[in-house]
Amino acid sequence: MIVEVFFRNFYRNYAKFDIDAVEKREFAFQYFEGGIVRHRAFKTLEELKKFVIEKTPRHIYHSSAYYERPGEEDMERKGWLGADLIFDIDGDHLDTEACRESKLVSIACLNDAKEEANKLIDVLTGELGLKPRRVVFSGNRGFHIHVSEEEVLTLGAKERRELVNYLKAVGFDPSRFVVKKGRKKVVLYEEEVGGNLFRIRQGVEDPRALKIEIDEVVTQDIHRLIRVPGSINGKTGLLALPLSQQDLEKDVEQIVERAIVFKKGNLKLRFNKTFEGAVLFEKINAREGDVKVLPAYLAIYLELQEIGKIYD
């Protein structure tokens, strides 16, 4: 498979995985031919890289959890030591026009996801006093935020669920802050613990502004597998790109440009279905059976999405 060769060459020459405490993580791999392998453990990043070059998986994941025995298949015997707090913001969960109209990677939808990621980081730092350890462009339609501070590592699923409810404003009632005074409505604000007055004000004016659209299943799962930062997303061919918080203030086009790893050359793609739409930086208009010469990164993306097939 041509795409697999591209992946292998990238991992051999450029791979740089960004993982803390690799020796305490469980790893999982999904291959191009199908199937997933879990419960793999590595002592060093170099050992992991050697394995990846040899096997060339389509997807690479590591556990949010730290284990005494990460390679143990029995979850009860792994020896759970704690887990990072992981937040997944994905275009699939955003009810915006840009994200609804297409399930492919679009700049407009990523802008919406970036705005949501910035909102989350503001709440984590401003209201909860938590500093993200890592911010990652997922390589697809969103962002992953990792928090690794000691006080969150041993939170159980119940506590993480309560945090999810707080971030998603479950049970928030705007009417609590509005009273009638004659014919007028007066909005009352009360400074609450955590300093979230500004978010309350926004929520009273527009309840949707209070809610942060995170994937709740990801955050509350203390054994969650998350895509390895620095690996290629096997759905798109884009890099799961580690970012600084300052990067989230930049145009999303700059983030996507840095995540494109197959920048050189062109490839022929035969479309297996009629397709019209925007993909990454390009507009595509093709009928089933059409053959087009495309930039390598775009042809790889479309094959991974099963829209076409690369051929020599």
Curated annotation (Swiss-Prot):
A GO CC term?
A: DNA-directed RNA polymerase complex
| EC annotation from Swiss-Prot or TrEMBL | 2.7.7.-
Q: State if Transcription is listed as a keyword.
A: yes
Q: Its Gene Ontology biological processes?
A: DNA replication, synthesis of primer
The cofactor(s) it depends on are: Mg(2+); Mn(2+)
Query: Where's the active site on this chain?
Result: 88, 90, 215
Which keywords accompany this UniProt record? DNA replication, DNA-directed RNA polymerase, Magnesium, Manganese, Metal-binding, Nucleotidyltransferase, Primosome, Transcription, Transferase
Q: Which NCBIfam families match?
A: primase_sml
Subunit structure as annotated in this protein's UniProt entry: Heterodimer of a small subunit (PriS) and a large subunit (PriL).
Q: Per its record, how is this protein called by name?
A: DNA primase small subunit PriS
